[in-house]
């Protein structure tokens, strides 16, 4: 008799995706982040669902409802901080997942990579709208500043901004629609993640060497299920430690002050995971130019596969490219630091230099270095 998991219409989909899936025998812990992102998404949807039961998306009561969740709801404080810090964990896993893709040449699977870029945009949009919901000072002013960027679009800009606001400023209509979008987007993200996985399983996983691994495959279960469970346990350990010991470590104190349209905070800045893009935005004195640079700083990932000039897929055997990759990582960390600093000397010039280096490395320096490495190997 054939095994039920291989014949049942629903179970055979799960079987071919998570049980009998042929996987390369040499994939390292850098391949754990896909499953960790899935776990993060589940945590966010569940905690978000319970928060939505008590939250009210009205400018008069939003801040109070969040306070009520933390003070009066059973374990409300835990759910709220799991959700807030879960977002940080989500982005840590996202950045490491994308970094792995860049290092090992996973971007050569075009469909998988492009859906991944789309997922990154969707998660960033969701996180931005979620940050507005508590209706603190930084929520309100962050929403005002970021939505106002659309006014840089020629001709339709100002109309577009007012359309998104639902009025002449960030107000009740804005908060209500942001809550609606923040609720629906994670389910769209889950669907996109399914498509991401579908395309990945069409080709099979890449591996650290970047070579074809068809000759050496092992079943996903039990080898990688056990490995993924270890990763999940470490993720939960890190998240619970953060939530229980220092839940406000990554937040902004200004968000504990209710939103006040008449009082601007001294330094408006987004959550830490947007600081690198915010630094690129601020480093260009022109409004439209800044907005374009902001969008391109993420959209540039979609161009990376077309800039691959090396004869080898992975950076595993390319020391010069490895060096440049880690310079890029250091550059992004520098941009993250600059994004959180006030707009004054010397931070302005450091931000501008780091922004130029970011685009130069990806668009010019790394492709040229790959060609140089080809010549070194007489390829």
From Swiss-Prot:
InterPro entries: Cyt_b/b6_C, Cyt_b/b6_C_sf, Cyt_b/b6_N, Cytb/b6-like_sf, Cytochrome_b, Cytochrome_b_C_euk/bac, Cytochrome_b_N_euk/bac, Di-haem_cyt_TM. It comes from the Eukaryota. The keyword Coiled coil does not apply. Heme b b562 binds at residues 83, 182. It holds the Pfam family Cytochrom_B_C. It is a multi-pass membrane protein. The chain crosses the membrane at residues 33-53, 77-98, 113-133, 178-198, 226-246, 288-308, 320-340, 347-367. GO terms for biological process: mitochondrial electron transport, ubiquinol to cytochrome c. It is found in: Mitochondrion inner membrane. A ubiquinone binds at residue 201. The keyword RNA-binding does not apply. Its cofactor is heme b. Changing residue 39 to I: In strain: Isolate IZEA7514. Keywords: Electron transport, Heme, Iron, Membrane, Metal-binding, Mitochondrion, Mitochondrion inner membrane, Respiratory chain, Transmembrane, Transmembrane helix, Transport, Ubiquinone. Heme b b566 binds at residues 97, 196. GO terms for molecular function: metal ion binding; ubiquinol-cytochrome-c reductase activity. Its main location: mitochondrion. Component of the ubiquinol-cytochrome c reductase complex (complex III or cytochrome b-c1 complex) that is part of the mitochondrial respiratory chain. The b-c1 complex mediates electron transfer from ubiquinol to cytochrome c. Contributes to the generation of a proton gradient across the mitochondrial membrane that is then used for ATP synthesis. The cytochrome bc1 complex contains 11 subunits: 3 respiratory subunits (MT-CYB, CYC1 and UQCRFS1), 2 core proteins (UQCRC1 and UQCRC2) and 6 low-molecular weight proteins (UQCRH/QCR6, UQCRB/QCR7, UQCRQ/QCR8, UQCR10/QCR9, UQCR11/QCR10 and a cleavage product of UQCRFS1). This cytochrome bc1 complex then forms a dimer. PANTHER family: CYTOCHROME B (PTHR19271:SF16). Belongs to the cytochrome b family. Heme 1 (or BL or b562) is low-potential and absorbs at about 562 nm, and heme 2 (or BH or b566) is high-potential and absorbs at about 566 nm. This is Cytochrome b. It comes from Sorex antinorii.
């Amino acid at each position: 008799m054939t095994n039920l998991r291989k014949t049942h219409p629903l179970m055979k989909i799960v079987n071919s995706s998570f049980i009998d899936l042929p996987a390369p025998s040499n994939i390292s812990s850098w391949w754990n982040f896909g499953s960790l992102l899935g776990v993060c998404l589940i945590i966010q949807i569940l905690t978000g669902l319970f928060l939505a039961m008590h939250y009210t998306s009205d400018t008069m009561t939003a801040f109070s409802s969040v306070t009520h969740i933390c003070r009066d709801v059973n374990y409300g404080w835990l759910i709220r901080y799991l959700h807030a810090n879960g977002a940080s964990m989500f982005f840590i896993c996202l950045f490491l997942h994308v970094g792995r893709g860049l290092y090992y040449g996973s971007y050569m699977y075009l469909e998988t990579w492009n859906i991944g870029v789309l997922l990154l945009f969707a998660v960033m949009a969701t996180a931005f709208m979620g940050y507005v919901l508590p209706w603190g000072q930084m929520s309100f002013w962050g929403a005002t500043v970021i939505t106002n960027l659309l006014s840089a679009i020629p001709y339709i800009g100002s109309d577009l901004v007012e359309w998104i606001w639902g009025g002449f400023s960030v107000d009740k209509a804005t908060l209500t629609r942001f809550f609606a979008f923040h609720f629906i987007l994670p389910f769209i993200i889950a669907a996109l993640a399914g498509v991401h996985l579908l395309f990945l399983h069409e080709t099979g996983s890449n591996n650290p060497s970047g070579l074809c691994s068809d000759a050496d495959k092992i079943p996903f279960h039990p080898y990688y299920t056990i490995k993924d469970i270890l990763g999940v346990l470490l993720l939960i350990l890190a998240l619970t430690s953060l939530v229980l010991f220092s839940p406000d470590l990554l937040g902004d104190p200004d968000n504990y002050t209710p939103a006040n349209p008449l009082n601007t905070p001294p330094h408006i800045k987004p959550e830490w995971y947007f600081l690198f893009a915010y630094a690129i935005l601020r480093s260009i004195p022109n409004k439209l130019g800044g907005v374009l640079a902001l969008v391109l700083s993420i959209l540039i990932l979609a161009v990376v596969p077309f800039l691959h000039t090396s004869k080898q897929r992975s950076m595993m055997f390319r020391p010069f490219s490895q060096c440049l990759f880690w310079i890029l990582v250091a550059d992004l960390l520098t941009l993250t630091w600059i994004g959180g600093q006030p707009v004054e000397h010397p931070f302005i010039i450091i931000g501008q230099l780091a922004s130029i280096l970011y685009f130069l490395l990806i668009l010019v320096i790394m492709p040229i270095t790959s060609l140089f490495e080809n010549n070194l190997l007489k390829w």
